């Protein structure tokens, strides 16, 4: 959400996630110094059902309202979650149903709808979009590309720019392409959230810049990233450590900007435990949401899969 240097500072402070991962390695360590997001005081959520009409619980970990699991080391976090996706066992759960601001983790849902539109044939990765204006934001340091009116680029570059380096303007451009307006696209986001069981989530934009009425929960984000990971393209995008973001400027000249992921585990700036690989992921940073990261992990030896959120 913010400029790259601030995101880098956040990733270097992500000691808590390393310690969450180390729990998988059976060290049992934790940290009290990392806040994953800002909890909202807007009521108590009902218990989630043990299983639903579509058998949701058979595919997902189930955590009761207020249930804390091995959470003593995470009292300094507003939310923390670690799930063994192979067994559906919850290893860590702290405030997973408390409402939080998702920041750029919002873009996971945006990515879902874009990939669904591609798979349905409504749009193509190769479609070229020409901008009629520069997309601007009230937040002076909102992460955005250099695109202005008259620039053109492919849907692929818009999607990759959105998911890899968190360009907020790319989200707005894609939303308007698919739904005609960002507001209509948010209606689609909220409908999709309900469809997958993320019923304590409400989106009012496609990028995650702060709005008091834009919120989710750690558990809902768990459901959302699982939906995101159903798409093969998600893994292609999330595996990249660099990408050449390419567009044609208003004068007809090709411009190439090499972008890097906001996840510094991928760039190598933060060490990642040996023997594990990263699947889908998304970071988030705003003044109100503070710093967040959700990530899929795989034990390369056993094939066991995990989802971690801090």
Stretches found by the model and what they are:
Residues 29-30, 198-199, 210-215, 219-310:
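Domain-terminus/edge residues, biased toward the C-terminal soluble/receptor-binding domains
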């Amino acid at each position: 959400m913010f400029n790259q240097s601030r995101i880098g500072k956040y990733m270097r402070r992500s000691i808590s996630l390393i310690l969450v991962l180390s729990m998988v390695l059976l060290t049992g360590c934790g940290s009290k110094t990392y806040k994953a997001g800002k909890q909202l005081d807007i009521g108590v959520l009902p218990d989630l059902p043990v299983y639903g009409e579509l058998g949701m619980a058979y595919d997902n970990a189930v955590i009761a309202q207020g249930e804390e699991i091995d959470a003593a080391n995470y009292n300094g976090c507003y939310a923390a979650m670690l799930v063994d996706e192979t067994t559906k066992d919850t290893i860590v759960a702290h405030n997973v149903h408390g409402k939080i601001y998702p920041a750029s983790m919002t873009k996971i849902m945006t990515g879902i709808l874009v990939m669904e539109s591609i798979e349905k044939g409504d749009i193509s990765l190769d479609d070229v979009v020409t901008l009629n204006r520069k997309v601007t934001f009230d937040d002076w340091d909102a992460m955005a590309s250099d695109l202005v009116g008259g620039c053109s680029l492919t849907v692929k570059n818009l999607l990759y720019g959105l998911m890899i380096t968190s360009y907020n303007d790319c989200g707005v451009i894609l939303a308007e392409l698919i739904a005609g307006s960002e507001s209509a696209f948010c209606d689609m986001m909220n409908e999709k959230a309900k469809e997958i069981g993320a019923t304590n989530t409400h989106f009012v934009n496609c990028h995650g810049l702060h709005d008091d009425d834009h919120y989710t929960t750690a558990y809902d984000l768990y459901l959302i990233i699982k939906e995101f990971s159903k798409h093969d393209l998600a893994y292609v995008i999330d595996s990249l450590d660099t990408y050449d973001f390419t567009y044609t400027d208003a004068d007809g000249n090709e411009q190439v900007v090499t972008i890097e992921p906001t996840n510094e585990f991928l760039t190598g700036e933060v060490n990642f435990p040996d023997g594990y690989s990263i699947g889908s992921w998304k970071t988030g940073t705003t003044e109100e949401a503070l710093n967040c990261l959700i990530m899929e992990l795989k034990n390369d030896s056993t094939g066991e899969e995990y989802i971690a959120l801090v």
